[in-house]
């Protein structure tokens, strides 16, 4: 009887380990299906007010590896030339003619609206989160993610993933106590070329900002390698040169 119980427990442990490994591998696959590890990107951010009024921003972004990303504001004219840089958990904002780049935090937002700096300068999910649990939900996988450090913007994520595409359809961003902060909706599949087909639109809303909505529209994503020197404070004023 004892041998039977022991064998059963071993089976459970092995099965649990298999789930964890599968979940971790799936999360890495989701990262690569969303973006190449290093890329250049053009996108538009739209903030929608409760009265329907909108404010739009156009950004050019570059990323290298799992923890380096920078973005340059192209529009509106009032923001043109501003740039942001993220190295791991550290973020900076450069404003032309103001001086040195200033530190910003992940929960602030350089554009206002529901998207915060962590959303705008997003890293690979697998770089910031561990998979606590993996479930099935009809035609979707459901991953329960836990932040690796306290510096990550959201302590927990619930990620619904299309089984056929290994791409997210919805992500709930939660506090440690599982209070909902915001929900991300992934929409409108698009072929970006180079073997990359992914949602071209991410919409977000939040119970903390009732009536507000923010939308991220991806126009171009292209695999491209960059030198490390691009992801430095001294290069922030020169990001426009990457577009030439």
Task: Give the location of each predicted region.
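Flexible, processing/modification-adjacent segments and terminal tails
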Residues: 21-38, 44-46, 53-55, 79-155, ...
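Structural motif
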Residues: 67-68, 90-91, 165-167
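N-terminal, post-signal-peptide region of Sec/Tat-exported proteins
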Residues: 42-78
